[in-house]
Amino acid sequence: MENRSRFASEDFLSWDKEGREVLVVCVAGRFELPSAGRPTTQPLRVSEAQRPPPPADAYWGEPEHSSPRVEGQRVYTRPGTDVYVSGHAWAPGGRPTREAAVGVRVGACRQVARVWGPRVWQRGVLGLKPSTPRAFEKVPLHWELSAGGAGAPDNPVGCGVYASVSAAVDRPLPQLEDPERPLESPTQRVTPVGFGPVARHWPSRRALAGTYDERWVRTRAPLWPEDFDERFFQAAAPGLNAAGGLRGGEEVVLAGMHPDGKVEFHLPRVHLQVESRFRRRKETRALVLDGVHLEVDEGAVTLLWRAAVPVRRDLAEYEGSVVREEEGRP
């Protein structure tokens, strides 16, 4: 594949839900975030060092016991546009505090959380209650610090939810909570607040992958099951997938993620297309923006675009593809 854009790209073969072979082209464009505390309408600078789309998931620790750091991009489609955020919730001005707020807004996507210093469940007159939070300067925006625990379908690596009251004594509470639905009991089931990708093996996402049973082995393997749901390819936390898709130009506000104040800007407007040549035909596809990764600590944002070109049993006649940026479009 010939890449004439300013960004990094990869291509790979896959099958779609109907079992048709497709050539997938994915482009990752990395840009520099503006300074905190200074809203800007100026275009973001393209980073000098571009990184290819990550081929596989990467985790903060062991995959079975930690949350994803990066979502792998070897998928043929993604409904809507995912927004992922990695970084920290900061105390205002970087001065230690016991409680703060953090939030992100990208177009119509929005996520907010109350941030606490470290707390544990402690015995009280009427049962267990949260201890007084200790002061903090910054808190990682990881699922491990949100509500959940072993057996929780939405967040099995989280904390604060336990099998029994006795099992919760002196055990940690979440440091990231829904401000409108805080955890009030160690056996309560609440919806966790997250900013990073949801792991594909967590029950809430795995349920969309379809049924892999004896019938599938006999009639479909290695294709996707008949009950496969393409929403399985969505990895964004609830509230951070734009169902109608983002197109570029949307306003972005990051609050509480930098000690110097809000980070405010607009997503870059980039239009990409791929032209794939076969011996007897040519296919042209526009790449769709289906991922935005805000790496606040690194001062960068990565946009991910994707297109799937039908192969139509012509793989032996495939001659190559060219990725271009379309100039002059609004």
Residue ranges and their predicted role:
Residues 2-330:
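Extended intrinsically disordered or low-complexity segments
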